[in-house]
């Protein structure tokens, strides 16, 4: 089997722009170049029409009203606008916020910033499977709690939280509920009405759209208020000033339209690839799947291989584009904070690979990846004195290493 290498298996970091999306974008860079805010001539009207069509397509994927979609530069900005915007608007009602230890840095660092501004944040832990305990969430809610932020699907381990149940808890107590859905859109059904979500962050480049464009869903009924974080010409109903990049918005709209249309077949494709990969690595000993396999986006596998050094593993499989830890932070050699939150030890957290499949991934590529990983794990373990000791039945935890 000849597979063109390197094989891209890092679709949770970014996706290719679908050819249909790129084609749709090009005219808005050349011919239809007007500013959508120019309402006195045809160039502006045409651009505005394209923006509104995209807004409707994005809203359709998440079952929202187009008027509830606010364009941003991506999910990081959407997270910032949602969390800071809501916290600043509702701070007279209370200054307590709740989130989860395994959230994306865009949420965690925003929360840290609000702590510096005098807000109090509760960081919920997760169970071994990566899911939060709903009873723990209920217990954390106080009279002065104004916002809960929980991601739909985790960027590292792909675990899907019980968002409708959390939405129910928040709605009952009149608490604003924000969801980072960057990794969920186009991979699992997303319905803001059914899940009682107030604010939802989205990104185009995780859904075969262009980078640098995202959106924030802001509920109108019951209305959720935000304080703007970007000031200027009052674009996007005052929520987010700045000239709209028509070509990127058109790209995001088309990407979300295709995602809605092809969701079922995409999900089936991902499941098939996941099963092929799992079957391919079946024989390897001391393999740990990180995160719940049931409650999970179908295109994500995060696997730890005991007695293998993470960095040497990445180097050994250089024919594969995969990541260890989250791409935003994989430049640091710190073990993944998400895996640590699951209770994984440093060794297992270090030896993890995140393998994420995409629309363009083939069965042959996945077969190749599984076989390559299997053979490299074998070779690396042959070199490992720890593996040898483990195979000899020595309990490595009982060894007292000499301090140098």
UniProtKB/Swiss-Prot annotation:
Top-level taxon of origin: Bacteria
InterPro entries: Aminotrans_V_dom, Aminotrans_V_PyrdxlP_BS, Cys_deSase_IscS, Cysteine_dSase, PyrdxlP-dep_Trfase, PyrdxlP-dep_Trfase_major, PyrdxlP-dep_Trfase_small
Residues with N6-(pyridoxal phosphate)lysine modification: 206
Catalytic center residues: 328
Broad enzyme group: transferase
One GO molecular-function entry: pyridoxal phosphate binding
Primary localisation category: cytoplasm
UniProt: pyridoxal 5'-phosphate binding residues: 75-76, 155, 183, 203-205, 243
Gene Ontology terms: cellular component: L-cysteine desulfurase complex
Record keywords, A-Z: 2Fe-2S, Cytoplasm, Iron, Iron-sulfur, Metal-binding, Pyridoxal phosphate, Transferase
GTP-binding in keyword set: no
Pathway: Cofactor biosynthesis; iron-sulfur cluster biosynthesis
Cofactor field: pyridoxal 5'-phosphate
Keyword Transferase: yes
GO biological process: [2Fe-2S] cluster assembly
Localization per record: Cytoplasm
PANTHER family referenced in this protein's UniProt entry, alphabetically: CYSTEINE DESULFURASE, CYSTEINE DESULFURYLASE FAMILY MEMBER
Free-text function comment from the UniProt entry: Master enzyme that delivers sulfur to a number of partners involved in Fe-S cluster assembly, tRNA modification or cofactor biosynthesis. Catalyzes the removal of elemental sulfur atoms from cysteine to produce alanine. Functions as a sulfur delivery protein for Fe-S cluster synthesis onto IscU, an Fe-S scaffold assembly protein, as well as other S acceptor proteins.
Summary of subunit composition and partner proteins: Homodimer. Forms a heterotetramer with IscU, interacts with other sulfur acceptors.
Family: Belongs to the class-V pyridoxal-phosphate-dependent aminotransferase family. NifS/IscS subfamily.
Protein name according to UniProt: Cysteine desulfurase IscS
Species assigned in the record: Neisseria meningitidis serogroup A / serotype 4A (strain DSM 15465 / Z2491)
Gene: iscS
